[in-house]
Each structure stands twice: as structure tokens, then as C-alpha cells.
């Protein structure tokens, strides 16, 4: 499989995606399922295709993705980040376009940890005056 593929690793929240790109007809396969079947929501599919639409490469590459961890939104973001990195690995000339759209930067936002004495990360226990 390593043959003539370009590779990119994408991360978002707790999801990690390994993306392999090669010249082809535009098929996107995520965990052995077509992208339309894997991501049930339209927003997830739009997020995944965003770097390809921006660079006018929607039907020029076959993409194979292995993604693990997190939920649907995090996985879609991780796949997008991986596709972006793989496209830059393939052709560095695409980087300014992708960078201007904010797709090259890894979204570093993570879930804030729950603190002791709180219900959640910031939700305090109810205060009783008496």
C-alpha cells in the first residue's frame, strides 16, 4: 500500500487520522467505508472535502483513511487535517491556499479536565447561604 501514496497525519480533539492519497477518480474511503456512509451528517462530509474543494482536487485523488478515537465531529476534523497535510506533502504549492483558509494549523482545543469539588470542569456545586 505504501507504493505511490502521499501520507498525512491529522489530529483533532482525541481523534487521530492516518491519510493516504494517490492519483485517482475521487473516491474517499474512511475505515473501509465510503465517506458518505461513514459520516452520517452532511457537515462531517463537508468538513472532510473542504481541502479538496479549496484546491480544486475533488475528483483527482483517491483517499484512504484510518481514523480512531473521539466522536464524529473530532474524526471529521482529524481527517480534514490529515488530507491537508497529505496534499502539502504531494504539492507544496497548495500550502498558501490551505494556510489562508486556516486548514494547516492544528486546532489545539481539548476538553478541559473536571476539577475536584465541581460538578464538571467549571460548573460549581450549588451554593447554600444557610
UniProtKB/Swiss-Prot annotation:
Which UniProt key words apply to this protein? Ribonucleoprotein, Ribosomal protein
List GO BP terms, alphabetically: translation
Any one GO molecular function term? structural constituent of ribosome
Q: Which domain of life is it from?
A: Bacteria
Give the Pfam families listed for this entry: Ribosomal_S9 (PF00380)
Matching entries from PANTHER family are given as: RIBOSOMAL PROTEIN S9, SMALL RIBOSOMAL SUBUNIT PROTEIN US9M
Designated name of the protein: Small ribosomal subunit protein uS9
Species of origin: Thiobacillus denitrificans (strain ATCC 25259 / T1)
Gene name, please?
rpsI
Amino acid at each position: 500500500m505504501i507504493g505511490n501514496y502521499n501520507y498525512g497525519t491529522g489530529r483533532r480533539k482525541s481523534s487521530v487520522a492516518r491519510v493516504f492519497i494517490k492519483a485517482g477518480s475521487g473516491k474517499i474511503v474512511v475505515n473501509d467505508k465510503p465517506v458518505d456512509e461513514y459520516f452520517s451528517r452532511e457537515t462531517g462530509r463537508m468538513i472532510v472535502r473542504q481541502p479538496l474543494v479549496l484546491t480544486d482536487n475533488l475528483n483527482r485523488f483517491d483517499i484512504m483513511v484510518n481514523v480512531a478515537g473521539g466522536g464524529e465531529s473530532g474524526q471529521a476534523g482529524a481527517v480534514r487535517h490529515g488530507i491537508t497535510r497529505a496534499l502539502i506533502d504531494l504539492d507544496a504549492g497548495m500550502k498558501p491556499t490551505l494556510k489562508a483558509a486556516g486548514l494547516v494549523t492544528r486546532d489545539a482545543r481539548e476538553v478541559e479536565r473536571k476539577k475536584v469539588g465541581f460538578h464538571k470542569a467549571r460548573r460549581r456545586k450549588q451554593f447554600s447561604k444557610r
